[in-house]
Amino acid sequence: MKQVMKKAFWKKTAVFLMTAGLAACPVLAADSQAKETSARPSMQVLVGGAEEREELGATELDSLSEITDPAEAVVSGESQTEAAMSAAEAPAEQIPDGMVKSSLTGEYVPAEIGNRRPVAFMIDNVKDADPPSGISQADLYIECEVETDLSRICAVFEQYDDVAKIGPLRSCRDYFISLAAGLDEIYCHYGQSAYALPYLESDDVDNLSGLMSYPYNAFFRDGPHAAPHNAYTSGEQINELIRTLGYRTDHEADFTPQYTFRAVGDEDTLPGGQDAAYVDLGYPFNHPCFEYSGETGLYSRYQHGSAHVDTENGEQLAVKNIILEYQSGVTYQDTHYLHYHTWNSGKGKYITNGKAVDITWSRESFYSPVVYKTADGQPLKINTGKTWIAVIRKDQLKDCRIGTDSENTSCVADAETVAAEEEKIKKWSAWYKEIEESYLSKMAQIRNDNVAKHGGKTKVEVGLP
């Protein structure tokens, strides 16, 4: 029922979506709303110069999920299942009655909160959108650069009911869907790029868009910013919209949190780690950085040259942990939109308590949970508390710095590693450009075939679940 309702809403805004974004992607513009059926046609792609057969998933829209990036060696041989089993072998933590460990922070929260699906909000992060509203109450943050080197934040809330104003909200990018997919979240945004549309349209994503014609309007515009930096919502309105759309509100019984947390009160001080009292992400426009306080044990955030503050309560954003993921990023052909190969593996940093250590990350597919491991291949156990996850493009590693203060920093990777990673990204970019046209053309063909199969109508128009 919920999916029929959801698909009907997409039909109402077909004209807007076609005119607002799909011009950037001509091969998908032929039919922006048809969705893949259970048939699995295959396509030829080039991987490192060799032809391989890859099948296109019915609802995953995940044709590249099994392709190994030739510029990145697989860094983890242990499967996600094995990692989960290893974590399960640890002594059970004694959790107070009526409480559960939060899947976002590892802290104890009431069961009705911890068992509920979180909501991820896409937050505008340009200077004209500062200061934000409500996001100091988020439990997890995911930051990534979008087009023209601007950054955007995905603020994930477990307890959002009483937050009166959340925003400013901005549009979705496809890689943010992948970065948050393992959280079993409901995804809230205000519009989307053309490349995100097929994923949002799939049954794998429950989303709330400020540009949709819903029976209940959960979004509003308010000061102090001018449009498009003034779109907001509230916890109460989001709850009502979720009920209206009939989305599942609780985690399913087999849900496994994607992060492994240490026991409450058992902190890892990362002995022997690199000094990391100051962390500069190296993003060129908002210049985000974090400073560690030994008194609070938290990293306070700064950007645009001043404290990053929530205007609703005056609180500066602060987190216990910072995780850096080094990823390959290229632009879609003939556009300025970025594409990250999120379903891959790579290196990164785990930063907490004023120290930093090397880690690895991996995702098996576009929608898979992320797996973090220590340098020796063990599951990474994160200190309880809020975490800031930042994706660092490999060609910008030289700008990301860690040290004791803003004057005494070093690049997150040595010069030799930076040079090697920059060479890898060149090879990866060339490889991706080889297969992109074939990939997008095949996706358009499948969508058009589905239209013909349903008598000239899209799945949206015939109301299929």
What are these regions (language model features)?
Residues F16-A24:
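Bacterial N-terminal signal peptides
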Residues A30, F220-R221, Y439, M443:
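Intrinsically disordered, low-complexity regulatory segments
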Residues A24-P41:
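Sec-dependent signal peptide cleavage junction
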Residues S42-M43, A71:
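Ser/Thr/Pro/Gly-rich low-complexity, intrinsically disordered segments
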Residues I67, G77-I142, E147-K427:
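A surface/extracellular/periplasmic glyco- and lipid-processing/surface-interacting theme
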Residues G48-P91, T417-E434, S438-K442, I446-N450, ...:
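Ser/Thr/Gly/Pro-rich low-complexity, disordered linker/stalk segments of secreted
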Residues M1-L17:
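Bacterial Sec-dependent N-terminal signal peptides
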